[in-house]
Amino acid sequence: MLPGRHTPRRADAAAAAAAMEPLVPGATRAALSEFVATAVFVFAAEGSVYGLWKMYRDTGTLGGLLVVAVAHALALAAAVAVSRNASGGHVNPAVTFGVLVGRRISFARAALYWAAQLLGAVLAVLLLRLASGGMRPMGFTLGHRIHERHALLLEVVMTFGLVYTVYATAVDRRSGGGDIAPLAIGLVAGANILAGGPFDGAAMNPARAFGPALVGWNWRHHWVYWLGPLIGAGMAGALYEFVMAEQPEPPAAADTRLPVAAEDY
């Protein structure tokens, strides 16, 4: 028998198994974890903006920026902490995309995560609108004299930093178990909001922008909050995975087995 004779058959079997992955109970539980964690994060994050507007009719002050940054940092840290064991604690389609670029997750599972994250964000904003007596969500908008190209660059840079932090503290096996990951991820998100909030709101998360946009039906500049984070996340995932991460030693003998699906971290 020639080596590799049945490789196409194995490849077909692996592809079929990967396509069925969303139906596996573990994948379903992971997606549910992402749904709940994203809803928790977006409810607290967007809720902090609701609260400021309810009390002061203004969210553009230094104090307001600090409140929103702290709320996002704490909510994201908590959301990552409660979901990391079940799903890896992505809570963000951009993070999932960065992990996909690094080949740490299969496309089938990534698609399942994206759907769960977007639905969780929409549910959170719907609940906020109901609980607030019909207040429209604030959502994201560009600051005075800020062009879309400026906001796009900001989102690329800020999301790059966020996803790079995810890789360094949660994905990399050298991080010592990733116990610091939720705090580090929350802190970098809060710091980025302090830096970029006055310019474009500092979303760094397509789901965070999508929920308010859908519920409030305001799509102006919305593409910026998808394209920027996805570019930044892809760059961070590629850089860390293929340059910064410790590469495994080559096996003594070639292993022709094909995995069913990429392992999530």
Curated annotation (Swiss-Prot):
Transport is among the record's keywords: yes
UniProt keyword list: Membrane, Repeat, Transmembrane, Transmembrane helix, Transport, Vacuole
GO CC annotation: plant-type vacuole membrane
InterPro entries in the cross-refs: Aquaporin-like, Aquaporin_transptr, MIP, MIP_CS
GO biological process entries: water transport
Topology in the lipid bilayer: Multi-pass membrane protein
One MF annotation (Gene Ontology) recorded for this entry: water channel activity
Compartment annotation: Vacuole membrane
Entries under PROSITE patterns matching the protein: MIP (PS00221)
Domain of life: Eukaryota
Transmembrane annotation, as ranges: 32-52, 62-82, 110-130, 151-171, 179-199, 223-243
Family: Belongs to the MIP/aquaporin (TC 1.A.8) family. TIP (TC 1.A.8.10) subfamily.
PANTHER family, per the entry: AQUAPORIN TIP3-2-RELATED (PTHR45665:SF14), AQUAPORIN-8 (PTHR45665)
Domain notes: Aquaporins contain two tandem repeats each containing three membrane-spanning domains and a pore-forming loop with the signature motif Asn-Pro-Ala (NPA).
Name of this chain's protein: Probable aquaporin TIP3-2
Annotated source species: Oryza sativa subsp. japonica
Lineage, uppermost ranks: Eukaryota, Viridiplantae, Streptophyta, Embryophyta, Tracheophyta
